[in-house]
Amino acid sequence: MKRIGILTSGGDAPGMNAAVRAVARKAMHEGLEVYGINYGFAGLVAGDIFKMNESTVGDKIQRGGTMLYSARYPQFAQEEGQLRGVEQLNKFGIEALVVIGGDGSYHGALALTRHGFNTIGLPGTIDNDIPYTDFTIGFDTAVNTVVEAVDRLRDTAASHERTFVIEVMGREAGDIALWSGVAGGAEDVIIPEHDFDVKKIASKLQSSRERGQKHAVILLAEGVMHADQFAKELAAHGDFQLRSTVLGHIVRGGAPSARDRVLASQMGSYAVELLLQGKGALAVGIENNKITAHDVRTLFDAKHHAELSLYTLAEELTF
């Protein structure tokens, strides 16, 4: 193996650039040529491919987003799209790839491996919804961004004795809301993985007010419902001064945290090691603070589970 490619796919996440940097520099250290593929699988099919060097990834580790850009390309699920990608890989002499993205990106990685190009997947998503990894690249930064916003919103909530419902990203996973809720001292956390009762929440808020706590912050995962709808349902059970806020794509941006930079560097380096061993169709993760790899096919039938012990802790520490 002499040449490998790197692409980022799906939603961007802080730390993707750190992962690209690690893959590129580790591969170059091992004597490999490295090619960057712009715009994910769409760029692969279009042949938007360029040779990288050490300076290409210089001054990138601290930057959010992805220097390789990203795009969704559902056509790659079809054989025709895959064959067009294979044609471009052959044209540039690329023999293996590292794909950085969410669960959808892993399907593309498996398809390319089946076509004879070993491909390793790295979990790049703020949602932390990938099975067989405790953390995904970008999750820690996203939580820190949310917590900073929660701290700021709590200031104004306290000033006006209001209850803020803060909706955060995460798709069908509640990890961002859960971790941010505990770190931000939220009065309640609503996630898809756990049932909730609006009437009981209203009752707890009222009891808290009677004890002198005149303001509150509630973290709501977007996979449950929209913040406005939740606030409307909550208002039906009590006389609360409610405000709803949506923390949208701001959570995906910004410089990656130190933890995400280190995690991305570890995963990127390990991905190259796996390729040098002739392995493909593997998904890299971190489990119990150890970098691991699993057959990517096992991820499709598995389901990520939120750390419900953390949910219990959140309940014990609120109201």
Swiss-Prot record:
Chain positions recorded as ATP binding sites: G11, R72, Y73, G102, D103, G104, S105
Give the quaternary structure: Homotetramer.
Keyword Iron-sulfur part of the UniProt annotation:
no
Which annotated residues bind Mg(2+)? Answer: D103
Entry-linked InterPro entries = ATP_PFK, ATP_PFK_prok-type, PFKA_ATP_prok, Phosphofructokinase_dom, PKF_sf
Task: Give the catalytic activity.
Answer: beta-D-fructose 6-phosphate + ATP = beta-D-fructose 1,6-bisphosphate + ADP + H(+)
Against Pfam families, the record matches this protein to: PFK (PF00365)
Q: Which GO terms describe its biological process?
A: canonical glycolysis; fructose 1,6-bisphosphate metabolic process; fructose 6-phosphate metabolic process
- UniProt cross-references to Gene3D superfamilies, sorted A to Z: 3.40.50.450, Phosphofructokinase domain
* HAMAP family recorded: Phosphofructokinase_I_B1 (MF_00339)
Q: What NCBIfam families does UniProt report for this protein, alphabetically? A: PFKA_ATP (TIGR02482), PRK03202.1 (NF002872)
* Source species, domain of life: Bacteria
The cross-references to SUPFAM superfamilies, in alphabetical order and at most eight, read: Phosphofructokinase
Activity regulation, short description: Allosterically activated by ADP and other diphosphonucleosides, and allosterically inhibited by phosphoenolpyruvate.
Task: Detail which positions bind ADP.
Answer: R21, A22, V23, A24, R25, R154, G185, A186, E187, R211
Query: Which keywords label this protein?
Result: Allosteric enzyme, ATP-binding, Cytoplasm, Glycolysis, Kinase, Magnesium, Metal-binding, Nucleotide-binding, Transferase
This protein is called: ATP-dependent 6-phosphofructokinase
Cofactors, names only: Mg(2+)
GO molecular function list: 6-phosphofructokinase activity; AMP binding; ATP binding; fructose-6-phosphate binding; identical protein binding; metal ion binding; monosaccharide binding
Annotated function: Catalyzes the phosphorylation of D-fructose 6-phosphate to fructose 1,6-bisphosphate by ATP, the first committing step of glycolysis.
The Swiss-Prot or TrEMBL record describes its family as follows: Belongs to the phosphofructokinase type A (PFKA) family. ATP-dependent PFK group I subfamily. Prokaryotic clade 'B1' sub-subfamily.
Pathway it belongs to? Carbohydrate degradation; glycolysis; D-glyceraldehyde 3-phosphate and glycerone phosphate from D-glucose: step 3/4
